């Protein structure tokens, strides 16, 4: 199985999403042989969209990123919540891999995803608790990820969430415990 592992947590070793995404990869390795490709979107950022970058010199990078996506059977995405959404580094990656005619196409019925049959695990790290209650309305992280993945045809998405990371020691430990319990079910 080919696994594309994306990390976008800016806090590197202290990043909750990096820790959880690595634990997901480790669990996948326990279960079967995998070929792993790791792309660190912080250490090696994908440039943000700009008019000048949409010229021909960007095509090799776009082709490389799209091919990594297409080659993978499984994606593991380390996606922390920053200001209620995903990091700009991860958004820049999506901006490059959403390519009309390659990862989706327009039809008379609307857009149709072309990246089918893949499994995605999202390692979601959050300082607060946004999966329930009034704060759920502020979650533009997981909802965005599910929608953008569905747009390109990927609907088999499992979110492994570590919440409450900045709410004190007890909620932090509970958040990690719940994430680890979810990982054990993979």
Curated annotation (Swiss-Prot):
Catalytic activities: 2 a quinone + NADH + H(+) = 2 a 1,4-benzosemiquinone + NAD(+); N,N-dimethyl-1,4-phenylenediamine + anthranilate + 2 NAD(+) = 2-(4-dimethylaminophenyl)diazenylbenzoate + 2 NADH + 2 H(+)
The protein's Enzyme Commission number: 1.6.5.-, 1.7.1.17
Pfam families reported for this sequence: Flavodoxin_2 (PF02525)
What InterPro entries does the record point to? Flavodoxin_fold, Flavoprotein-like_sf, FMN-dep_NADH:Q_OxRdtase_AzoR1, NADH:quinone_OxRdtase_FMN_depd
Q: GO: which molecular function terms?
A: electron transfer activity; FMN binding; oxidoreductase activity, acting on NAD(P)H as acceptor; oxidoreductase activity, acting on NAD(P)H, quinone or similar compound as acceptor
Q: What is this protein called?
A: FMN-dependent NADH:quinone oxidoreductase 1
Can you quote the record's cofactor note? Binds 1 FMN per subunit.
Which keywords does this Swiss-Prot/TrEMBL entry list? Flavoprotein, FMN, NAD, Oxidoreductase
What protein family is recorded? Belongs to the azoreductase type 1 family.
Q: What is the species listed in this Swiss-Prot or TrEMBL entry?
A: Idiomarina loihiensis (strain ATCC BAA-735 / DSM 15497 / L2-TR)
Record-listed FMN binding positions: 15-17, 81-84
Function in brief = Quinone reductase that provides resistance to thiol-specific stress caused by electrophilic quinones. Also exhibits azoreductase activity. Catalyzes the reductive cleavage of the azo bond in aromatic azo compounds to the corresponding amines.
Could you tell me the gene encoding this protein? azoR1
Which SUPFAM superfamilies does the entry link to?
A: Flavoproteins
Cofactor(s) it depends on? FMN
Q: What is the protein's quaternary organization? A: Homodimer.
């Amino acid at each position: 199985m080919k696994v594309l592992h994306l990390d976008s947590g800016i806090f590197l070793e202290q990043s909750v999403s990096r820790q959880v995404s690595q634990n997901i990869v480790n669990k996948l390795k326990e279960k079967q042989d995998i070929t792993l490709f790791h792309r660190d979107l912080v250490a090696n950022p994908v440039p943000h969209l700009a008019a000048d970058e949409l010229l021909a010199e960007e095509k090799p990078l776009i082709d490389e990123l799209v091919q990594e996506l297409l080659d993978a059977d499984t994606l593991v995405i380390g996606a922390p919540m920053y200001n209620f959404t995903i990091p700009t580094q991860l958004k820049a990656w999506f901006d490059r891999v959403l390519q009309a005619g390659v990862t989706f196409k327009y039809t008379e019925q609307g857009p149709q995803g072309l990246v089918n049959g893949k499994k995605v695990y999202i390692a979601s790290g959050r300082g607060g608790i946004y999966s329930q209650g009034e704060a759920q309305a502020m979650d533009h992280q997981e909802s965005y990820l599910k929608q953008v993945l569905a747009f390109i045809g990927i609907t088999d998405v499992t979110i492994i969430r570590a919440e409450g990371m900045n709410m004190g020691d007890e909620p932090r430990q509970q958040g990690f415990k719940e994430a680890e319990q979810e990982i054990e079910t993979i």
